Amino acid sequence: MIDLKDLGTFESVPEIVIDIVKGNILALESALADGWDIHKPIQLGKYSEYSPLELALVMNCLPSVQWLVEHGADLNDEENPSFLLAVRYADQKVIDYVVDHGANIHALNSVEVDAFQAALYGKKYENLQIIHDLGHTVQKYGGKAFRNAITENNYEVLDFFIHNGVDINYNKPDSVYPFKPTPLCVAARYVDLQMCKYLVEHGADVTITEKDGMRPYSIAIERCDMEMAEYFKTLEPTEYHDKQNKMDQLKPFKLPKALVSFLEEDNLYFELPDSDFISIEFLPLLDTVPFKLGRRKLLRLSKELGEYNDWQIVWDPKSKKIGCYDTEHQELRELCKFDE
């Protein structure tokens, strides 16, 4: 069996692949003389193919990398730029070589991954400082990778980003986090209180909301993590938890008095045995979450909706009705008036 790292393990591969990963330059010269095209991808298994340069970089074989570059291999392939492969799989000698010969340090691959993310995927943490020192700086480019690293619980990696000036409140949308969370929101939703405290100690803002209005405190309430919720509550402005201030905030929503009274009751959890939802739990009035769907204002009323994690019960002031909001597809369905 032939192990090519995370490209896979193969019972057999073309002989040229062995020559590439072992740096057999004489064999590569001979193959070139016999008409081998160094730009043509090599088939591995039924469904995968890789360029010779990709194979050399993945296997950290500097002699083959050098030989291929000298013979015209493309260092800045749009789908798999050499710099990303080097920082994910290789050592500093290979990284320095491809950069010295024209590799774009700011390149993104076909799925918008940058160098910091590539190094994290490959667990080549020692390459993070190299990337930064080459000019792909943490301050300008590190936010996305930093946010992605939160769920790995690797504090040494997080320290690297923070000490090099990462935007600790980075919240641009991407394919992983389209709902625009900050790293602190990610920590509140997917990690633990220790991580939240770590981020706050390094300047994370507890008041920044996600696209749907959720802030770290709201996320903790949703998760029923009252220790975390109390922690965030002590850090938030006092007016966030003042009833009169909340009522002023909710005036544009024109809530029916009956709905206000309902949300102030003690029991906000209901079993729904004859419904697909199974159960529903509403948020207390002070914890309801205003947000916008496009230009339309909505107020989230539900804490959880049975097994439907992507659905929320909302109040729509435009229709003056209760609605159901599908967060995954960003669709709003009108249900009924509150008293119905």
Report the location of each language-model feature.
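Ankyrin-repeat boundary/"N-cap" motif
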Residues: 8-18, 41-54, 76-85, 108-117, ...
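The conserved C-terminal loop/turn that links adjacent ankyrin repeats
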Residues: 35-39, 72-74, 102-106, 135-138, ...
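A generic tandem-repeat structural signature
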Residues: 56-124
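Ankyrin repeat A-helix N-terminal signature
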Residues: 18-24, 54-61, 85-91, 117-124, ...
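Elongated, non-catalytic scaffold/linker segments and compositionally distinctive motifs
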Residues: 146-241
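Ankyrin repeat structural motif
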Residues: 24-33, 60-70, 90-100, 123-133, ...
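A surface-exposed partner-binding patch
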Residues: 11-12, 211-314
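Solenoidal tandem-repeat scaffolds enriched in leucines and small polar residues
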Residues: 98-166, 174
